[in-house]
Amino acid sequence: MPFKPLVTAGIESLLNTFLYRSPALKTARSRLLGKVLRVEVKGFSTSLILVFSERQVDVLGEWAGDADCTVIAYASVLPKLRDRQQLTALIRSGELEVQGDIQVVQNFVALADLAEFDPAELLAPYTGDIAAEGISKAMRGGAKFLHHGIKRQQRYVAEAITEEWRMAPGPLEVAWFAEETAAVERAVDALTKRLEKLEAK
């Protein structure tokens, strides 16, 4: 089976599970009814097209028609779209580029913000509520532990490179070097102006 249909089917299943399961989200979903959102991930040659209908969202790899809105961003930016307060900041910083009707992406972000992404709800039909909650807690704890471990290792490597091995300058050394370079540049400019004045006489 080709990779692209497998990815689109997985994303479609995930979005439908979280965005179309709860009846409480019906009003938020109705704002997207009939809209087409194209998501282009920088670094990948293909894009994902989200077609919203009353009962589900279809995720397609190809779409012949025009999209109501096109979102262009790196893959690392897409998870930040769950928080609707970050949308404006992402657009202003240039991390997220929006072409077309911005209302479509705003409504999608609002819907994603309202939806509760809880892995325990996915596991509950198969394992029961208590086991699903325990597994979910263990997964969250493991992810947090892993995240802190990675951050700690990054800090250790950065300190080793700058302090112990002296392979790279520290932040204060870089700032000092930048100030000294700017001072030399100003002195050269002043000297050049003085020489030009002397040559003009």
Swiss-Prot record:
GO terms for molecular function: identical protein binding. It comes from the Bacteria. Residues 15-112 form the SCP2 domain. Pfam families: SCP2. One of its GO terms (cellular component) is cytoplasm. One of its GO terms (biological process) is ubiquinone biosynthetic process. Required for ubiquinone (coenzyme Q) biosynthesis under aerobic conditions. Binds hydrophobic ubiquinone biosynthetic intermediates via its SCP2 domain and is essential for the stability of the Ubi complex. May constitute a docking platform where Ubi enzymes assemble and access their SCP2-bound polyprenyl substrates. PANTHER family: UBIQUINONE BIOSYNTHESIS ACCESSORY FACTOR UBIJ (PTHR38693:SF1), UBIQUINONE BIOSYNTHESIS PROTEIN UBIJ (PTHR38693). This is Ubiquinone biosynthesis accessory factor UbiJ. The lineage of its organism: Bacteria, Pseudomonadati, Pseudomonadota, Gammaproteobacteria, Enterobacterales.
